[in-house]
Amino acid sequence: MTTLDDALATFATRRPVLVALDFDGTLAPLQDDPQTSRILPDGVTALARLAATDGVSLALVSGRSMNDLHTLAEVPAGTFLIGSHGAERARVTTFGLDRDVVQLSDEQADRLASLGAQALRIARGRDGVWVETKPTAVVVHTRLAEDEVARPAEDEAIALGEQLGSGVLHGKDVVEISVLRASKGEALVALRDELGASVVLYAGDDVTDEHAFEALGPDDVTVKVGDGPTAARYRVGSPQELVAALVALADPH
């Protein structure tokens, strides 16, 4: 059985390739306050080197809104950003973001407003539970809540999503209810095909990253960060371990 080091050594010889990575819990250690999340310093350097390498395309694939992802992620111009679990896409330029436009129908916009109002009712009176509104989704966050508060809030959010949403994603301390059907896997495959990448490296830590692992092929390099069952072929224990692997990939000599 090949090791991750072996797989990355082979990956480094292929062209063109796509290096696609989750943000929270993968490049950036998880934080109680999500606005304090940052890519590890060695990761910032490695991503810049990879992006400057001929035949290498770079992408971040995150559940965060595009605005959050662009604000927090220190990535070079040319990097593709896929936000909201595939519902938003943009490319970083020297002047900001070149965005793909997300257009909701009147019905979807009304449903999003209703979801937001009902999600706020779920959070009301529950310490540590808060609601984020994205362009295509509503997210109930429970990271700061005690377990006995978080569980019923998540259960109610899931039930709300099953009633009114087009898709429900239950990740680490979050329930996201979208009015558009999208997944990291679909978005990643679309980007790979658009770029004509011969092989993809994808790493992620959450259950939502399993969609990407499952969508990729046997020649692609899929890496689970942390514990838990996974469809990924390889595993590392922490963002620090993943960044070390990226440093080696970016500077194989």
Locate predicted features:
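Mg2+-dependent phosphoryl-transfer enzymes with acidic/Ser/Thr/Gly-rich catalytic loops
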Residues: 1, 14, 185-253
